[in-house]
Amino acid sequence: MTTSHPVLGPEGPIRPTAASPDPAPIRAVLFDFSGTLLQIRSYAERIHAVLGEQTADAEVDRLLVGLEAGLADPEVIRAQQGRDVSARAHRHAFTTWYASVPALAPHADALYDQLRTPHHWMPYADTEETLGRLAHEGVAIGVVSDIGWQLPPTFAHHGLDRHVSAWVHSYEHGTEKPDPLLFDLACGKLCAAPQETLMVGDNPYKDGGAAGAGLRSYVLPAGATPGCRRGLDAVLSLVRDSRRESRPSR
């Protein structure tokens, strides 16, 4: 006896499953924001911006070491819990981390405000090209981000907003990825079914978790250098391949 909702054992379904239809063509793509389409400028540049360009490189290096150490600070760790569920929690999480370095504590708010300032962000070298080609091919595009502020001004500053038809900001909904609610909201805004939608990001848990909501997902390696090519051409290949595979054979 087959089932359409299998119970999975360690090696796979316990009972045979009903034949699955071929994967649907991808009609919509959802992107993560930071680390996927754009990246904040380097911490060294940001520190120079708040302390002054005359700050010695050795001093900046010392502060960067302090930020690295701050990630293990118990107070900083506590502040990250639920970071993206509200604007207030988001600011608190980041400013607590910045302030864990005594020399940066007076500048914690200024460093946080850089996050909300469009010119501090850099699109990856292939972001514009990828979004433009997807839009040209009729693919609906959305952005789903764990974040504490509105993203359209940043995209507009870089001329990218015209490609994006849906925005889902975690802080507006009191939850974080991979909550299916966020992916469902984005699919609804794009009038695309989850099985017709691809989620692209750089976090295996948060962005890869879109699979739990019925989407396909593509996860990029984290930690790309600001301004480099991100490898987003693979997204175009996935979309095109899905459409070729869905065409009836002659």
What residue ranges belong to the model's regions?
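N-terminal helical cap/lid subdomain that shapes the substrate entry/recognition surface
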Residues: 7-125
